[in-house]
């Protein structure tokens, strides 16, 4: 059995919507690649009030974060919550941080969202650091949350979005946060997870010897410079060199 570690509850037009989160690392490590199923979450008796608005939807996902030593140093951050926008709510702003950005190269951001409809594109927008983004034709700039999957190219997720965007030109070296703005004049959209993968270089001392002088065969004078290039943090005091 799986029990939620955190639950999220919100309302829209006098209807309640909920989400939940729990860590299933042990299960995934034990079973590895394969097919995972979720059962015993029957809400049939509760969905009647949601049918009229077309918001009688349920879904789930597993987010897997893994390490590959052959890749560049990346900082992975998972932000979970349950933020909702629709024609009856105000636009939302989400501040993601702390994040250490060394470069926008190969930096990405992903969204897990519910209830977005492909047929409703009324005043819908997604901005990252003030820039309106999309990935047409799969994710138009005025209908980003439309039941699509950036990884497979599928447009048949039916109210579930797994969308990934490149952050080239949207983040700068030294940035410590990313600002997300989402709005909609009609379509109900629920932002459940946001995942960032940014190019991040940890503090790492590198040494350049500039002059070596031998004195009386038992004394050596060294002149050297310590570098901390392309790092997003200062070298801690006492770092061995």
Question: Can you say where each PLM-predicted feature lies in the sequence?
Answer:
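Short beta-strand elements of extracellular/lumenal beta-sandwich folds
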Residues: 216-234, 239-241
């Amino acid at each position: 059995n799986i029990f939620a570690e955190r639950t999220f509850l919100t309302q829209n037009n006098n209807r309640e919507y909920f989400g939940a989160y729990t860590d299933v690392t042990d299960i995934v490590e034990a079973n590895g690649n394969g097919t995972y199923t979720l059962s015993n979450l029957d809400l049939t008796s509760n969905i009647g009030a949601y049918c009229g608005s077309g918001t009688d939807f349920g879904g789930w996902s597993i987010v897997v974060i893994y390490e590959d030593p052959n890749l560049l140093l990346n900082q992975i951050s998972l932000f979970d919550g349950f933020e909702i926008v629709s024609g009856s709510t105000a636009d939302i702003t989400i501040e993601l941080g702390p994040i250490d950005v060394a470069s926008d190269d190969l930096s990405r951001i992903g969204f897990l969202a519910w209830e977005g409809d492909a047929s409703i594109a009324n005043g819908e927008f997604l901005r990252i650091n003030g820039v309106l983004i999309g990935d047409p034709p799969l994710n138009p700039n005025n209908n980003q949350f439309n039941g699509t999957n950036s990884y497979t190219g599928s447009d048949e997720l039916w109210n579930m979005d797994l969308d990934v965007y490149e952050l080239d030109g949207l983040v700068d070296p030294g940035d410590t946060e990313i600002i997300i703005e989402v709005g909609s004049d009609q379509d109900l959209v629920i932002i459940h997870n946001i995942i960032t993968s940014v190019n991040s270089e940890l503090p790492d001392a590198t040494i350049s010897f500039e002059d070596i002088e031998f004195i009386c065969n038992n004394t050596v004078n060294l002149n050297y410079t310590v570098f901390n290039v392309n790092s997003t943090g200062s070298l801690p005091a006492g770092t061995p060199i």
